[in-house]
């Protein structure tokens, strides 16, 4: 553990602990991906690149929509790394992603606090350079 590291904001419950029990501890990245989605694959590959660049990059955890789940091995092959993942049904997936939001969903949490929520492929789309600036400002 790096002692001088910012302990971050006061811990809160993000509402995502049903997927990962430790999601509200420290810095975490939770992704809402669809196995066959090209933009999701690109986002995963970008996150892998950031993890290679920074030893202390937040842990990345994925929630996949249960659609074309046979494509998950190919998804990780493309990303260059297998991240921890859960597969959930279509309706709960969209409910958790949130109303009006689209995939890929990339959520940056610090002690459960929502710091950044990227979604879709338009102006709120995931951008690894922007995330890098948010984490390593």
Over which residues does each language-model region extend?
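Short, internal strand/loop/helix patches
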Residues: 78-105
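N-terminal "domain-start" segment that seeds a small globular fold
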Residues: 1-21
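Short active-site neighborhood of thiol/selenol oxidoreductases, capturing the structured segment around
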Residues: 19-41, 59
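C-terminal luminal/periplasmic domains and tails of membrane-associated envelope-modifying transferases
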Residues: 38-42, 53, 136
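Non-catalytic, surface beta->alpha helical segment in thiol-disulfide oxidoreductase systems
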Residues: 97-137
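Structural microenvironment flanking redox-active thiols in thiol-disulfide oxidoreductases
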Residues: 43-77
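Structural motif
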Residues: 32-36, 64-67, 119-120
């Amino acid at each position: 553990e790096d002692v001088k590291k910012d302990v971050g904001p006061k811990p809160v419950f993000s509402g995502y602990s049903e997927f990962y029990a430790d999601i509200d501890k420290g810095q975490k990245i939770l992704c809402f991906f669809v196995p066959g989605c090209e933009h999701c694959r690109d986002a995963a590959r970008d996150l892998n690149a950031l993890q290679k660049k920074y030893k202390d990059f937040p842990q990345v955890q994925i929630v996949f929509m249960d659609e074309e789940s046979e494509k998950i091995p190919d998804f990780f092959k493309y990303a260059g790394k297998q991240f921890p993942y859960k597969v959930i049904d279509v309706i709960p997936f969209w409910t958790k992603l949130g109303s009006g939001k689209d995939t890929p969903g990339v959520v940056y949490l610090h002690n459960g606090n929502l710091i950044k929520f990227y979604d879709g492929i338009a102006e709120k789309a995931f951008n690894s350079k922007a995330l890098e600036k948010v984490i390593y400002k």
